[in-house]
Amino acid sequence: MLIALTGTPGTGKSSVAERLRERGYKVATVVELAEKHGCIIDEEDGEIVIDVESLAARIDFEGIVEGHLSHLLKPDVAIVLRCNPAVLRERLKGRNWSEEKLLENLEAEMLDVILVEALEHASEVYEIDTTEMSLEEVIEAVEAIIRGDREARKRYKPGGIDWLSELEDRIEEFMRKV
């Protein structure tokens, strides 16, 4: 079974994946698999460009694949980690990214971009709001989903997180000023 651990940068994917690996799970990153299968197209501005379609066609991995593109690999299960954009902004500030890249990622989180893509590519999709959870709580939620725990799968079914409605008052106020 192929399980994608995905989400906007800063939601906790790498930290969760590292701990799951320590607990004995078979974990790989999208970049590791792309290197193994010769699916790296280019490196632009220090970022690796991956041919995701080729990788999805060639992948023979059984386990957890971590990365913000992992849900595009046609996984059996996609677990999308989410984070309130206000908190996510603080998490991403320390990454020395341009304001443009920061805003692009915040916008993607607000608009559910990765969740929507996961729903298009994965057989089963779950979403976990990591905003106020400890790392251990997130890991426990991920493990429960992997185990097939019915309560966890019900609790983390997609559609429960809506950042835009939380910001609705602010958006309306802004629109009145325009």
Swiss-Prot record:
EC number: 2.7.4.3
Ranges where the record places region NMP: 29-50
Keyword Thylakoid assigned: no
Residue numbers binding ATP: G10, G12, K13, S14, S15, R95
Sequence segments annotated as region (LID): 94-104
Function as written in the Swiss-Prot or TrEMBL entry: Broad-specificity nucleoside monophosphate (NMP) kinase that catalyzes the reversible transfer of the terminal phosphate group between nucleoside triphosphates and monophosphates. Also has ATPase activity. Involved in the late maturation steps of the 30S ribosomal particles, specifically 16S rRNA maturation. While NMP activity is not required for ribosome maturation, ATPase activity is. Associates transiently with small ribosomal subunit protein uS11. ATP hydrolysis breaks the interaction with uS11.
Subunit structure: Interacts with uS11. Not a structural component of 40S pre-ribosomes, but transiently interacts with them by binding to uS11.
Protein's UniProt name: Putative adenylate kinase
Natural source organism: Archaeoglobus fulgidus (strain ATCC 49558 / DSM 4304 / JCM 9628 / NBRC 100126 / VC-16)
